[in-house]
Each structure stands twice: as C-alpha cells, then as structure tokens.
Amino acid sequence: MQFLYKIPGYILLLFGGFCLSWGGFVIRSFEEASVWQILLLRSSFFMIALIIFLIITYKKNTIRVLKDAGFAGLLGGFVMSLSFIAFVVAMTNTSVANVVFIISTQTMFLAIFGYFYLKEKVSLVSFISILLAMSGITIMVGDSLTSGSFFGNLVALAIPINFSILVMIIRKNKNLDMVPAIFYSGIFSVIYGLILSESFVFTS
C-alpha cells in the first residue's frame, strides 16, 4: 500500500471527489432507515475497509501506529466523526447538489483557519475565491429558507468546517502519522450509530 503515497495529490483528490459523489445516491437508497441506522451501516463498512488497509499497510506495527497517534489522533478522529454525522444528516435534509457545493467550500475555511491558527498569508486569488464562495453560500442558504432545506444546508456547513479543523490538527502534528485519526473517526461513528439507532433492521 506504500504506492499510495507516491500518487499525486490531485489524482487522489479527484478520486475522493468521485467516491464522495456516490454518497448521496447510497444514502437516499435507504428510504425507510433512520439517520443513525444509515450512519451505523456506513461506518461499519468503512471500518472493515480501513482495518484491512491498516493491516496491509502497517502489518505488525498497526497497534503501535494507532497508539503513537495519541491524543491528537483521537481528537482528529472525533472531529472527523462529526463530519460523518453532518454528511448523513445533510444528505437526508437537502439536495445532493447543495451538499456537494457546500463541501467544496472547504478550501475557503482552510484559508481562513490557516490565517488565524497557522499565521499563513492569504493570497489575493484565495481572498477573491473566499468572497465568491461566501456569496454562493449566502445565495443558497437564502433560497433554502423558502424551499424548506435550510436545516440541511446549515448542517452541511459543518462538514467543510470540521474537515478544515482536522487539517489544522494534522498540520500542527506533522511529526505524527495521523492515518489512525481516520480509524478513530470510524470507531466514534459506529458508537454513535449503535447508541442512537432504534433498531438494526434496514430497508432499501
């Protein structure tokens, strides 16, 4: 699995976006399932895939890597798990297009958080992009007041915000392997689903 680290970032980003675009279709296919049931099912399969990835990648060092991530890994996992919840809730309360657009504003929040937290300068291009993104969100949220999807759009905003916070945590802990944070996010999400699901019967 070490070959993944050699793949250009933009290719991984495009592939991630492609996979994410199917999220709405999968979530909407469970018409009778509650938000927490969907979260539990989604997180369970996520955990299975991730455990396989970790074992193949780190082999006998898997447990050590998970421990070495420490509090930063747990905090990053908790923050990411909140994004998982927001994604499922948003997808069931507003359009897929709205959710995907709002998620795409993550770069805006990264620039803002980076400026205040990491003291990174914001270029003119980034500043203009932030203004355009904010304008788009304002128009979208304003329209949703009459369409009844305001709550879904508002929850969707938590996704790019939490992911940006996660990036800040990762940047602040460059000396740590933060892949375990993804593992912990799956654990948190499964726990949420187990506690809050009324039943474990799924209807597609």
Predicted region positions:
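Hydrophobic transmembrane alpha-helices of multi-pass small-molecule transport proteins
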Residues: 50, 54, 80, 122-142, ...
